[in-house]
Amino acid sequence: MDKQYPQQQWQQAVIAYAQAVNDYVAQGRAQGWDNLQAPQVPATDHLLDAWLAALQAANRPDCSEQQRQAFRQAWPPAHQPLVPLLDEHGQGISNVLLLGDGSLLARIGMPHEKGQVLRIDRHGVTPVIGVECFGRCPARRYFALGNAEGVRVTAGWGGPQVQRLAWPTGLEGLPAGYPFEPFDLPPAPTALIPFPDGQRVLLVSADGTFVLASDGATRLLPHQARVLDALAEGTEPEDISLGLSMEHGAVSADGRWVVVGEQGSRHLVLDDRLRLVAEIGPGSEYPHFALFNQRGDQLLLNACHFYSGATLAVRVADLPGLRTDYYSQDPRTPLVQDGARVYAGVARAGEYIIGDAYGYLRAFGEDGQEHWQHYLGSTISAMDISADGRTLVAASYAGIVAEIALDSGRPAWQIGTGAHGEVRRWLFWKGWDKPLAW
């Protein structure tokens, strides 16, 4: 019997498993899932040492681009073989952005972790000094750059500063005359979204959701009414929880609408003067995510229960005065995706692309028609898309960032139903001296 080299074993196992999964999905959709047996995961643990040695060799400075591509062909990317290593090395990546020059920004670590902001380009990975968190306005013009001193807003990445904003004190919007404590440290942003005029920033954090402006911060969540109710019930100020779970937010590209939510609220929509205009009951237990479509005339709202969820859509024209309850059957808030707990998402012409708890990127139309799915693995933690809608970047809790060329054809090793090909991935793993490109 001929002895195969490790890369041959890896390549054959990865491609065979991807094809088996894709066939399984195709059969299930065509014929139903009854009596279908899921493909067996191939044994690849014994190949990990050889894979790591080859990966390290492909990242040496003297390795040519041709050699790197040959490595990728011999050792095609896959999630399942890496599972034994993830408990030790995997970590969340809380934010990614595609810059106009094709480079990437990534914040390694989740919001509550110290983390590090890095810039990734074809030449390597470089720390971004003096920036601890970042965000970009929905019109793609302004960037918010945060550190312990406050938030700078710049016109373009590396462009001139147009605004400098202070972090909230933590006392904003709380009833006067009670001994509430200010923040000891600035909130750790879950999201930092400049408004399209560059003058204000939506700060979403586990310590509260605020709008930062030159004249101070305005608290949006938790709402003062909730605090007043707790005080009226006799709860001591120090016992009132001001923290949020599953906090999220979005700003429309024209700046007219602000969407916020958290585990204990409905989906809340405010106008540009921060007046409440809509309260939309979620399609599952806990509001979890919000996203506007590319045209800005539809809003996507996801809620979750455990690792599943339901996603509603609502026309922006229907927002003023809209009030619906949990699990409402209101025709103005149709269900457009059933099943996904959405952690990240982007929109392009006529299509939403969301990242779910099971490591899938799922695309569907504004009418809810399913388009395709693409498997990355772990849980998707952050996403961005290029202005032309042709390049997608997705990050996961496995410490992986992947760049995907949309509509470019699907390689044989890719699990998915869409014609999309990953062109590069990076592993930002705990315990490694440096990130490695795959």
Residue ranges, per PLM feature:
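Intrinsically disordered, low-complexity acidic/Ser/Thr/Pro-rich linker and tail segments
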Residues: M1-H123, G170-E181, P222-E238, R424-W438
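Hydrophobic beta-strand positions that form the internal "hydrophobic ladder"
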Residues: L104-L105, F143, V201, V258, ...
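Repeated scaffold domains used in trafficking and secretory/extracellular systems
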Residues: E88-L97, V128-Y142, G173-I193, E233-E236, ...
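Structural signature of WD-repeat beta-propellers
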Residues: L99, I108-H112, G146-E149, V204-A206, ...
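A short beta-strand motif characteristic of beta-propeller blades
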Residues: P81-D87, H123-G130, Q161-L165, P175-F183, ...
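Structural motif
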Residues: H112-L118, E149-A155, D207-A213, G264-V269, ...
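Conserved loop/turn motif of beta-propeller repeat scaffolds
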Residues: D101-G102, A139-R140, D197-G198, D254-G255, ...
